[in-house]
Structures are given as structure tokens and as C-alpha cells.
């Protein structure tokens, strides 16, 4: 470790005191530091970084975070020995890693909260791309959530660069766009590097994993390999990726007894969400620039999904009423209790299944609003007669 507890670091007029070692990754070490009564995280790079990397980091700090969801670098630290580090805000303790959700250690309070997190994720990347950036390395370790509220935080933002520019980071296997895995050539003859279009692919992978708890390209073809090594991963995620719910190529369906969560959850995903995944993971392999679902498209689709949710009064399971399905659900998918009566609120093009606690958001009443997390109304029970809403 470069620092030990109570070491001090002076930068200009500020002095940071190291209070704890938080951990390390491939790039560097992270410390808990204190300055003027506030706590921050300090990341120190293990190796000397390039001048381009330093310039990019400095420029990102000057421009500031695209939104509050990004744990963005806020101050650059240069050391006499040539090492580089930066200060960022500390992740609050009520936030847990997305990885812990995938492994079952932590859960969202309910499906509506999970969808709020997904919408926030898409909104954050919409803003990032609008600022002219691409994230370039979306993976399961990049995100955190508050299990109770669905609030989002995004870490590892030091690799974010201007779109079409790359500083050496390609991404993490299982999340990278296939053309990045393969090292395809662009029209100009250069190697295809991460950009906004590869971000869109990786974002769809994260959303699929959030909704279905599995990877969209891991299915029956896993049986072709004695061990999933680099060669196997290259074939599954680069050379010849096949979406597990490809409409015509059924060679890679989820394995019963192994991908149980995917099989169970996919069955109750709304058809318009399924179509968006198919477009990205099938058509988007052929046409990366036009057929990958954009963050804004995801926001609208996921908001529609949230509008359709109702809660089973018997077991508390959240499921959709099925406005867009050929056959509406007449019983709870979890406990088979018959679907209770509910009212539908029609606002413009939105159909909102009313349930106790259901929220109405600003875009419902203002078609020009992009505040998909801003609540303007909520279904509550009558104080004098709780059976009335």
C-alpha cells in the first residue's frame, strides 16, 4: 500500500488525512480520507498513467459530472514521485453493489423499485451521451443501488472519455459489444473501439440481467465447452453470439434447471420489452448504429412497464396486467390467486394500472418533460375509510 493510516496529503490549500484502506483493483488502490470534516474516497493509480489519460481526467473534473448519479472525480492529485490520484465523493453505506443483487445477497424492495433503478440508469447514460462522452466499460461492477428506494450510483468514471476516443480500455467480457470483442475494422480501416453504440449494447446487457438475472448470451451453447475459457468466451460473446431468446435461432435457449431465473422471469416480461431486447441483441449485431435501443427508448419502455404493475394482495408479488399482451393475466404468477379488480387511469397515451401506492410521474401530465423520476401524484387510502382510495 502506498499510504498508511494517519498519513497526510497536501494539495494546494487542502490537506487530506488517510483514515482507512478501502480496497484495490487492477488499476489502483482506494483509501478513505478526511478533509475539513468531510470524508472522501481517494484513488491512487498503481502505475504511471499516460499524458493523455491525465489530460482526460483533468478535463472531466473541470466539466463536472453529467448527473448526480455519477461518483465523478472532483480533484486531481499529483505526487512528487510521478504517481497520480484523484478525490471523489464517498459512496453512502445504504448503497449496495449490483453484483450483490445478481448473486442473491441483496434485493430490491419490489419490482417497481427495481424498475426505478433501471430507468435512472438509462437516464444517467442518456445524459452522459448528450454531454459527448461514452462510458466504454459498462459491467456489473460499475453500479450500486439503494435496496429500499432504487436510487442509483455509478462508479469507475475515470475511464469515461469523449465519444470516439479511447485510452486503452475495451471493457469486460460478457458485457462488451461483439464488434469490440472481435476487434472489427471501421470504415476507415482502424480497429473498432468502444463508443456510444457499444455503450448501448452493454446497457441492454445490464438491463437484461436486472430483469432476468442471467446473461442474454449464455444458454444451451454452454454445453459445447468443457470449460468456459477465453476461447469459449470469444465464440459466445464475439465470434458468434446468439441471443437466448432469438426468434428463429433456438440453439441457445436457457438451460432448464440451470437458468431457472431467466426462464421464470422472461415469461412475465412485457412483450414490448422483449422486442427491444431482440432488436438490440439480434438486429443490433448487424446494424450497430441504428438497431440498438437507445437510453431514451428504454426510459419510455421501462416507464410503461412500471405503469402496468399491480401487486398481489395475497403474496405481495408485483406483475403486469398485460395491456399489450394478447391475453391478460387473470391470476398472480407467484401464488395463482385470481387477479383483483383494478381501475385504469388514462392520461394521453399512458395506461396506468391503479393500485395502492401507485405513482403518477411528471411526463404523464407534461409530454415535454423528461423528469421520469419526478412524482406528481400518488394513490393513497382514505383516512376515514381505508378501503377507499
Predicted segment positions?
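Catalytic-loop of the protein kinase fold
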Residues: 125, 129-147
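Conserved C-lobe activation region of Hanks-type protein kinase-like domains
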Residues: 207-274
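Conserved catalytic-loop aspartate of Hanks-type protein kinases
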Residues: 199
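Activation segment/activation loop of eukaryotic-type protein kinase catalytic domains
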Residues: 141-184
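Conserved structural core of kinase catalytic domains
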Residues: 71-117
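Conserved beta3-strand ATP-binding lysine motif
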Residues: 43-46
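ATP-binding glycine-rich phosphate-binding loop
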Residues: 2-36
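Forkhead-associated
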Residues: 356-389
Amino acid at each position: 500500500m502506498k499510504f498508511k493510516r494517519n498519513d497526510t496529503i497536501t494539495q494546494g490549500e487542502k490537506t487530506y488525512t488517510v483514515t482507512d484502506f478501502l480496497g484495490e483493483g487492477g488499476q489502483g488502490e482506494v483509501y478513505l480520507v478526511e478533509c475539513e470534516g468531510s470524508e472522501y474516497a481517494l484513488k491512487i493509480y498503481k502505475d504511471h498513467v499516460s499524458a493523455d489519460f491525465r489530460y482526460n481526467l483533468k478535463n472531466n473534473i473541470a466539466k463536472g459530472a453529467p448527473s448526480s448519479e455519477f461518483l465523478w472525480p472532483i480533484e486531481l492529485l499529483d505526487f512528487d514521485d510521478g504517481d497520480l490520484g484523484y478525490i471523489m465523493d464517498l459512496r453512502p453505506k445504504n448503497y449496495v453493489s449490483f453484483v450483490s443483487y445478481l448473486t442473491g445477497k441483496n434485493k430490491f424492495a419490489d419490482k417497481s423499485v427495481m424498475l426505478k433503478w433501471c430507468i435512472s440508469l438509462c437516464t444517467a447514460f442518456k445524459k452522459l451521451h448528450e454531454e459527448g462522452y461514452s462510458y466504454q466499460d459498462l459491467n456489473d461492477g460499475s453500479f450500486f443501488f439503494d435496496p429500499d428506494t432504487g436510487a442509483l450510483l455509478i462508479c469507475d468514471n475515470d475511464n469515461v472519455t469523449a465519444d470516439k476516443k479511447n485510452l486503452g480500455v475495451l471493457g469486460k467480457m460478457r458485457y462488451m459489444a461483439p464488434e469490440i470483442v472481435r476487434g472489427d475494422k471501421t470504415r476507415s480501416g482502424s480497429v473498432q473501439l468502444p463508443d456510444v453504440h457499444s455503450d448501448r449494447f452493454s446497457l441492454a446487457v445490464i438491463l437484461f440481467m436486472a430483469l432476468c438475472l442471467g446473461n442474454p448470451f449464455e444458454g444451451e451453447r454452454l454445453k459445447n465447452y468443457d470449460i468456459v475459457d477465453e476461447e469459449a468466451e470469444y465464440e459466445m460473446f464475439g465470434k458468434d453470439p446468439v441471443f437466448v431468446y432469438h426468434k428463429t435461432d433456438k440453439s441457445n435457449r436457457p438451460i432448464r434447471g440451470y437458468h431457472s431465473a431467466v426462464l421464470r422471469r422472461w415469461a412475465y416480461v412485457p412483450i414490448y420489452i422483449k422486442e427491444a431486447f431482440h432488436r438490440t441483441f439480434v438486429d443490433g449485431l448487424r446494424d450497430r448504429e441504428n438497431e440498438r435501443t437507445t437510453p431514451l427508448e428504454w426510459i419510455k419502455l421501462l416507464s410503461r412497464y412500471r405503469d402496468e404493475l399491480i401487486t398481489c394482495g395475497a403474496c405481495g408479488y408485483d406483475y403486469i396486467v398485460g395491456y399489450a399482451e394478447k391475453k391478460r393475466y387473470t391470476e398472480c404468477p407467484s401464488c395463482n390467486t385470481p387477479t383483483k379488480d383494478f381501475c385504469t387511469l388514462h392520461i394521453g397515451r399512458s395506461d396506468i394500472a391503479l393500485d395502492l401506492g401507485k405513482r403518477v410521474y411528471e411526463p404523464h401530465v407534461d409530454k415535454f418533460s423528461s423528469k421520469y423520476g419526478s412524482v406528481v401524484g400518488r394513490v393513497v387510502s382514505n383516512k376515514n375509510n381505508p378501503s377507499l382510495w
